[in-house]
A protein has these predicted regions:
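Pro/Thr/Ser/Gly-rich low-complexity, intrinsically disordered linker/stalk tracts
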Residues: 1-33, 88-113, 250-253
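Structural beta-strand segments of beta-rich domains
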Residues: 20-24, 155-157, 166-168
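Solvent-exposed loop/turn segments flanking beta-strands in beta-repeat/beta-sandwich domains
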Residues: 22-50, 180-184
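Short beta-strand segments within Ig-like beta-sandwich modules, predominantly Fibronectin type-III
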Residues: 51-58, 206-208
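Beta-strand-rich modules
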Residues: 63-96
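Disordered, acidic Ser/Thr/Pro-rich linker "stalks" and the adjacent N-terminal cap
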Residues: 96-162, 175-180, 250-262
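Trp- and acidic/polar-enriched beta-sheet ligand-binding modules for extracellular glycan
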Residues: 153, 179-262
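A short beta-strand element within beta-rich, extracytoplasmic domains
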Residues: 165-177, 230
Length: 262
């Protein structure tokens, strides 16, 4: 189109507030007189002008990396013809949805877990003592009771710490052969060893293979605790027992990035 360009009316534009984004939608009359539009706004985070070019056939534009805390964003629409001649600009205001905070974790120091800190509710009497979980030998193993009488799941490994912890990660390695690893875990904490609180369920992502290793994501218990249980609620193969080669627990560092409150 080479005639005089005319920008669409403000009434033709609607907006959607999305998490950390604004979606602009508009209609274009059938008799529109332009070839393309420029849609510009000033980013309040750095005061830089951002310009997007859209064709006459475009009907929507997603503006990402926006924040609700900035309130109104002012968008300037301006039509152009094929000769890059500009029509009169038009402005509309729109707001962003709230950008959720992001949380990341990094592994900290390994906690010194010794055999006397470990216990279970279902030790196999003939082999696989729980102390093997911290002996550093990948070919030894801990085993809950496979001999008769078997105890149905859930079954647990308990760690009684010598000091309080709150943000942590755990790691384990499956047995080398004849492995029966956890498929589902319930992570529980306590401060007296009698009253327990579930803080996380892990229902996917655990490994089934021989010698496979698993490192949990960071877990924030929400408060300090001195006792930890890894409660196995389901095993691969739906057995009434499980085994592991090694177990370790780490303190973890939690970082919260919340630009809406910076």
């Amino acid at each position: 189109y080479t005639g005089a360009p005319k920008t669409i009316d403000a009434s033709a534009v609607t907006s959607e507030a999305l998490p950390g984004a604004i979606r602009l939608n508009w209609t274009v009359p059938a008799d529109s007189t332009f070839s393309y539009m420029k849609i510009s706004y000033v980013n309040p985070a750095n005061q830089e002008t951002v310009t997007n070019v859209v064709s006459i056939h475009t009907r929507t534009l997603l503006i990402e990396n926006t924040l609700k805390k900035y309130g109104d964003y002012t968008f300037t629409f301006q039509a152009f013809n094929d000769k890059n001649e500009a029509g009169a600009p038009m402005q509309v205001k729109a707001q962003s949805g709230l950008l959720p905070a992001t949380v990341t974790y990094s592994k900290g120091d390994k906690i010194n877990v010794t055999a006397d800190m470990l216990s279970t509710d279902d030790q196999e009497p003939s082999e696989g003592p729980i102390k093997n979980l911290v002996d550093g030998n990948y070919n030894s193993f801990f085993h809950t009771r496979w001999s008769s009488p078997q105890k149905p799941l859930p079954q647990y490994i308990q760690v009684d710490f010598k000091e309080a912890h709150q943000v942590f990660m755990f790691w384990y390695r499956n047995r080398n052969g004849s492995q029966v690893g956890p498929e589902n875990l319930d992570i529980q904490i306590s401060n007296d060893g009698d009253n327990w609180e579930s803080i996380k369920e892990i229902l996917s992502g655990l490994p089934s293979a021989s010698q496979a290793e698993y490192t949990s994501e960071g877990i924030d218990a929400g408060k300090p605790f001195t006792h930890l249980r890894l409660v196995v609620t389901k095993t691969f193969g739906d057995r009434n027992y499980f085994n592991l080669a090694e177990l370790a627990v780490f303190d973890a560092h939690k970082v919260v990035y919340d630009p809406e409150n910076e």
